UniProtKB/Swiss-Prot annotation:
The modification Phosphoserine is found at S4, S477. It comes from the Eukaryota. Its main location: membrane. All members of the FAM83 family of proteins share a conserved N-terminal DUF1669 (domain of unknown function 1669) domain of about 300 amino acids. This domain mediates the interaction with casein kinase 1 (CK1) isoforms. Therefore, it has been proposed to rename DUF1669 the polypeptide anchor of CK1 domain. Residues 341-362, 384-495 are annotated as: Disordered. Belongs to the FAM83 family. Signal peptide: none annotated. Residues 2-294 are annotated as: DUF1669. Residues 447-458 have a biased composition (Low complexity). The modification N-acetylalanine is found at A2. This is Protein FAM83F.
């Protein structure tokens, strides 16, 4: 229930009557009825109701003409494309329920600021307020267009524009240069009625695809006035320019030639914490705005989308795949591309009949399941051990630990207190690792070894730990497989 209805249920509530003399006077049921009479019956019906209700004429002639031009009846609920095609073939469409209370689509995707946005910090700099006028009050004061262009040319992080009418080519050229040359993200929100004039200005500049890749243009309307018979569409009257998240210019100045040279305007430059409400307002406007595709309206090809499968597309959204993907699209642009492909696919199958598999949902489910089918991995071929290595020497078979020591598990090599295997074989992998770790330690200094002792393989000791460098002979051991004499261990110790 509405707050006014809940307040009426309160026992202690006193319904105070707010008249036209009160400052809080805003809504009047009699004025709403007069507005409905104007839109339904014209000027004559409006004047009769005003006279009957003893109201003052609250609408000027210009407002009455503008309201009648902005009024439009509610559109009928549009069914799916296939149902619409069948309805055309069988019988004409019948009127459905109004969208005023039963909307066809209530959940819409919030457009992301995919090019980036400034961090919202507690401190935005020194708060200052500067007023500029046209014509200038001081002799050397800059004109309003100069102030705006300097802000855009000095931008380094982000540029955000909210404007009712944007037709000045010089200002837009500065925005294009900032987006193309300095890679500054640009977001522009225009009034829906001024979009066509903005596109006319863009067509005169002969823009290329790569120059507008960092520019996002969207449109919004006013709040509007909803009635049972239709809706009055409002307009966007806000005008401000935000740069780098720390300064904003607002006022009556529009980005047009007339505002710069003909009209009298004010421009208020705010810095620091004063721009916090403008930051919130811009993000709210951007969330309810509609996309204006510059590539489509200007006839530009745009970036060609890659035909990724659904599995790969889901992975590319993950930031950890950014280095692998290379030239990966921003998430917002990828979602727009997917929605565009979905609309084109829906338009191509408009006249086709539904299949036996459940229609579009069944086809998507089947495509999703097919993407998840795993492919059997092909393992690399392993070359067999050469017979020469397996041939016995001196009537004794060679242990596989000498031919392929890497495939032996660590648990299968029990070691004794001196780093040797239990069967008398030394483990060269662990001995080498232990030797290198001690050799490159900062605390161990290796003195010069006499030439008489360096030629013979010996067992070196680092910090009371022995590391055998050669094969030591143990009784009953099979370590001597070369047939040579037994190597005598040396007692060389490095302190």
């Amino acid at each position: 229930m509405a707050e006014s209805q809940l307040s009426c249920l309160d026992e202690a509530h006193v319904n105070e009557r707010v008249t036209e003399a009160h400052a809080a006077f805003y809504y009047c049921e009699r004025r709403r009825a007069a507005l409905e009479a104007l839109l339904g019956g014209g000027e004559q019906a409006y004047r009769e109701l005003v006279k009957k209700e003893r109201l003052r004429d609250f609408l000027s002639s210009q407002e009455r003409q503008a309201l009648c031009a902005a009024w439009s009846p509610y559109e009928e609920a549009v069914s799916s494309t296939r149902a619409k095609a069948k309805a055309k073939a069988k019988f004409p469409a019948q009127p459905t329920e109004s969208l005023a209370y039963w909307p066809d689509r209530s959940d819409t995707e919030v457009p992301p600021l995919d090019l980036g946005w400034t961090d919202t910090n507690f401190y935005r700099g020194v708060s200052r307020v500067t007023l500029f006028t046209h014509p200038p009050k001081e002799e050397k004061a800059p004109h309003l267009k100069q102030v705006v262009r300097q802000m855009i040319q000095q931008a380094q992080k982000v540029i955000a524009v909210v404007m009712d009418l944007f037709t000045d080519g010089d200002i837009f050229q500065d925005i294009v240069d900032a987006a193309c040359k300095r890679r500054v993200p640009v977001y522009i929100i225009l009034d829906e009625g001024g979009v066509k004039y903005f596109l006319e200005m863009c067509q005169g500049l002969e823009l290329a695809d790569f120059r507008i890749r960092n520019i996002r243009v969207r449109s919004v309307t006013g709040i509007g006035f909803y009635m049972p018979m239709g809706k009055i569409k409002g307009t966007l009257s806000s005008k401000f320019l935000m740069v780098d998240g720390d300064k904003v210019a607002t006022g009556s100045f529009s980005f047009t030639w007339s505002s710069s040279y003909v009209d009298r305007n004010l421009l208020l430059l705010l810095t620091g914490q004063n721009m916090e409400p403008f930051d919130i307002e811009f993000r709210e406007l951007y969330a309810i705005s509609e996309e204006v595709n510059l590539h489509q309206h200007l006839g530009l090809a745009g970036r060609i989308g890659l035909n990724y499968s659904s599995t790969v597309a889901r992975k590319l959204i993950n930031p950890k795949y950014a280095l692998v993907a290379g030239t990966r699209r921003p998430p917002g642009e990828m979602m727009r591309w997917a929605a565009r492909q979905q609309r084109e696919a829906g338009g191509n199958v408009e006249g086709q009949e539904e299949g036996s598999g459940g229609g579009e949902s069944a086809r998507r489910l089947e495509s999703f399941l097919n993407d998840l089918v795993t492919v059997e991995q092909i393992l690399p071929t392993v070359e067999p051990i050469s017979p020469r290595l397996q041939r016995p020497t001196n009537g004794r078979p060679v242990s596989h630990a000498h031919t392929d020591a890497k495939h032996r598990s660590r648990e299968a090599l029990p070691q004794n207190g001196k780093g040797e295997a239990a069967n008398g074989e030394a483990t060269p992998a662990k001995e080498g690792k232990r030797f290198s770790s001690r050799l490159f330690s900062r605390r161990v200094k290796r003195p010069a070894v006499p030439s008489s002792m360096a030629s013979s393989p010996s067992t070196e000791t680092f910090a009371d730990v022995e590391f055998p460098l050669g094969k030591r002979h143990n009784e009953g051991s099979n370590a001597n497989i070369s047939g040579k004499g037994i190597t005598k261990a040396s007692n060389c110790v490095i302190s």
